[in-house]
Amino acid sequence: MTCTIDKILQDAKTLLERLKDHDNAAESLIDQSSALHKRVEAMKEVGTAMPEKYQEELADIKDASKLKPHVLLCQENTQIRDLQQENKELWVSLEEHQYALELIMSKYRKQMLQLVANKKPAPTEPVLEAHKTFSSDLECQIDRICVMGDIMRDAIQLDEDKAYNIQEKLAQLELENKELREILSTSKESLHSSKRESEWNFSEKTQ
């Protein structure tokens, strides 16, 4: 039982480390979104007079806003589902250990009651010493399970919070992606219009 409890405690700690990695990935995603937002603002300031040299950058921004955030968020959502499933499995294992301890304590109490009821004149010190040792071991096991339960509750709460935050960030990125596409469309139309106007003016002059 001790080895199994140690393994569950280690799994819980590993889960917390994974959630921290998940948080770091989300922060990286926010940084990417901020960079895209700054570039959007820069394009708004330039307006319809955007030089030709920015066309390649616009294409890169479009590809990044269209693919990269979506792929990363899909990966994050998959990790969230995996962590939620792992949380459920660890929680079930914890409940099984608690139930096993309750059964052990129940049988132990029955044996002690039978021993007291059927006791004969005999030295009581060995029985008391055994009772003390067994009780101490059980208390240690119960304390460790309580600690593990607290870790699991914190991990589950953290996992739920991260899932909610990822959904918010997904909505924000989708909105920014929509704005980027609108700006790209407007910029292209403006450039085409300017080009047509220049060609028309040139043809007028030549005539």
Swiss-Prot record:
Keywords: Coiled coil. Residues 4-32, 154-193 form a coiled coil. Signal peptide: none annotated. Residues 189-199 have a biased composition (Basic and acidic residues). GO terms for biological process: negative regulation of hippo signaling. Residues 186-207 are annotated as: Disordered. GO terms for cellular component: FAR/SIN/STRIPAK complex. One of its GO terms (molecular function) is protein-macromolecule adaptor activity. Suppressor of IKK-epsilon. Associates with the striatin-interacting phosphatase and kinase (STRIPAK) core complex, forming the extended (SIKE1:SLMAP)STRIPAK complex. The (SIKE1:SLMAP)STRIPAK complex dephosphorylates STK3 leading to the inhibition of Hippo signaling and the control of cell growth. Interacts with IKBKE and TBK1 via its coiled coil region. Interaction with TBK1 is disrupted upon viral infection or TLR3 stimulation. Interacts with CDC42BPB. Associates with the STRIPAK core complex composed of PP2A catalytic and scaffolding subunits, the striatins (PP2A regulatory subunits), the striatin-associated proteins MOB4, STRIP1 and STRIP2, PDCD10 and members of the STE20 kinases, such as STK24 and STK26. This is Suppressor of IKBKE 1. It comes from Xenopus tropicalis (Western clawed frog).
